[in-house]
């Protein structure tokens, strides 16, 4: 499944290079117009990242996101620095279908497990942003990649599987924003190890060949941001390559 994505800083559409706020590209686009275009081309899910909120919990762009959700028919998945149950509940209340939880799942595992019990596994997507070390271990980073988390991808998945984990977004940080292609070996490995989880691939997508490679890896979906913004290909072309599930 194709999941077009936009990242927002203070209401503007941006892209970061490898999660670095200092390496930011701003696009002169209306977020709603851009997402409406993706929707019109056939996207059933859209992914929005609140980068302002990820950096400063007191500056969350919830009002903007509420306006986007109300103006769109597609299902919306939102991430970016979710730290409290109130923030999670607020996003679900404004019509967000699924909330992406990253750093907190590493730092406050029991708290996030309780949210799975309360809100259900379909309302939450774990974001596992990994640095792969020389030993091949997939170490999950936290806090907008500004620090290593020290937990392996597998240990976190195993901690949440008893709570019904269904959706997980995995980014190889070394590929993010680089347009160097996805780490398909990573997705092939985790899809084989945990076939009952819907894996979303993210990071490095540049071409339709990259989309096809992820499709064939066993991942269930692919998040595409930069390649669409710089018009390497269109959402319509991506969906022709990897049709939405019926």
Curated annotation (Swiss-Prot):
| GO molecular function annotations of the record | 1-(5-phosphoribosyl)-5-[(5-phosphoribosylamino)methylideneamino]imidazole-4-carboxamide isomerase activity
The cellular location(s) given in this protein's UniProt record come to: Cytoplasm
Q: Which UniProt keywords apply?
A: Amino-acid biosynthesis, Cytoplasm, Histidine biosynthesis, Isomerase
Q: Describe the reaction catalysed, as an equation.
A: 1-(5-phospho-beta-D-ribosyl)-5-[(5-phospho-beta-D-ribosylamino)methylideneamino]imidazole-4-carboxamide = 5-[(5-phospho-1-deoxy-D-ribulos-1-ylimino)methylamino]-1-(5-phospho-beta-D-ribosyl)imidazole-4-carboxamide
Note whether Amino-acid biosynthesis occurs among the keywords. Answer: yes
Keyword Zinc carried by entry: no
Give the pathway listed in the UniProt entry for this protein.
Amino-acid biosynthesis; L-histidine biosynthesis; L-histidine from 5-phospho-alpha-D-ribose 1-diphosphate: step 4/9
- Enzyme nomenclature, EC number: 5.3.1.16
- The source's domain of life comes to Bacteria
Q: What class of enzyme is it?
A: isomerase
| Gene Ontology process terms (BP) | L-histidine biosynthetic process; L-tryptophan biosynthetic process
GO CC, any one term:
cytoplasm
Query: Where are the active-site residues found?
Result: 7 (proton acceptor), 129 (proton donor)
Family stated for the protein in its record: Belongs to the HisA/HisF family.
User: What NCBIfam families has UniProt attached to this entry?
Assistant: 1-(5-phosphoribosyl)-5-[(5-phosphoribosylamino)methylideneamino]imidazole-4-carboxamide isomerase
- The name of this protein is 1-(5-phosphoribosyl)-5-[(5-phosphoribosylamino)methylideneamino] imidazole-4-carboxamide isomerase
Q: Which gene encodes it?
A: hisA
